Amino acid sequence: MNGWNFQELKETPSQTGGPYVHIGLLPKQANIEVFEHNLDNNLVQDNTQGQRIRLEGQVFDGLGLPLRDVLIEIWQADTNGVYPSQADTQGKQVDPNFLGWGRTGADFGTGFWSFNTIKPGAVPGRKGSTQAPHISLIIFARGINIGLHTRVYFDDEAEANAKDPVLNSIEWATRRQTLVAKREERDGEVVYRFDIRIQGENETVFFDI
């Protein structure tokens, strides 16, 4: 790139998600039919391997009020700890019946959101470490310039969580708990509750990615 002085290049200005984020990214939720196959919160098929779970929660602002116009994406490994990507070169067989990625919007009335997925397996970390089962999550909403990245861990994986290099990189142990979803069983279904707090007391840990 001879002749280029990258110090002279200005950063492209960012914008918030705005009030029309659903029209662009989840048109069906805005009652606009565009796609034959709409994106949704279901990551599993009939033949998907692994334990079915539902991940659900709300997003709260600094005053403790639920946000009702947020959009959430998740991506995760399959039950064997393999991401459905050609870049994952662990040598393990990827589950062809698992999407590994989903997008949903919060309910306009209550702010609740949920995903139907499977509990992921542990994945390799740096320098031979192992990352505990987790789901990566990003939030888009009005008033947020850049999407907020966080992770969802599971409270019934305490031993694996204690060894996770990302959780251990968080200085205060009490802050790590903001990334741990609480398990319950409801009508025979395994549900993990994960509430996200944008600001204030018990603010969720977000990552600079």
From Swiss-Prot:
UniProt-listed SUPFAM superfamilies: Aromatic compound dioxygenase
Gene: pcaG
Annotated residues for binding of 3,4-dihydroxybenzoate: 142
UniProt-listed PANTHER family: DIOXYGENASE, PUTATIVE (AFU_ORTHOLOGUE AFUA_2G02910)-RELATED, PROTOCATECHUATE 3,4-DIOXYGENASE ALPHA CHAIN
Pathway(s): Aromatic compound metabolism; beta-ketoadipate pathway; 3-carboxy-cis,cis-muconate from 3,4-dihydroxybenzoate: step 1/1
Assigned keywords, A-Z: Aromatic hydrocarbons catabolism, Dioxygenase, Iron, Oxidoreductase
GO terms for MF: ferric iron binding; protocatechuate 3,4-dioxygenase activity
Presence of keyword rRNA processing: no
Reported function: Plays an essential role in the utilization of numerous aromatic and hydroaromatic compounds via the beta-ketoadipate pathway.
Organism (species): Acinetobacter baylyi (strain ATCC 33305 / BD413 / ADP1)
Family membership: Belongs to the intradiol ring-cleavage dioxygenase family.
This protein's name: Protocatechuate 3,4-dioxygenase alpha chain
Pfam family, one: Dioxygenase_C
Catalytic activity: 3,4-dihydroxybenzoate + O2 = 3-carboxy-cis,cis-muconate + 2 H(+)
Note on cofactor: Binds Fe(3+) ion per subunit.
Assembly and binders: The enzyme is an oligomer of 12 copies of the alpha and beta chains.
One GO term (biological process): beta-ketoadipate pathway
Major enzyme class: oxidoreductase
EC number: 1.13.11.3
Family matches, as NCBIfam families: protocat_alph
Essential cofactor(s): Fe(3+)
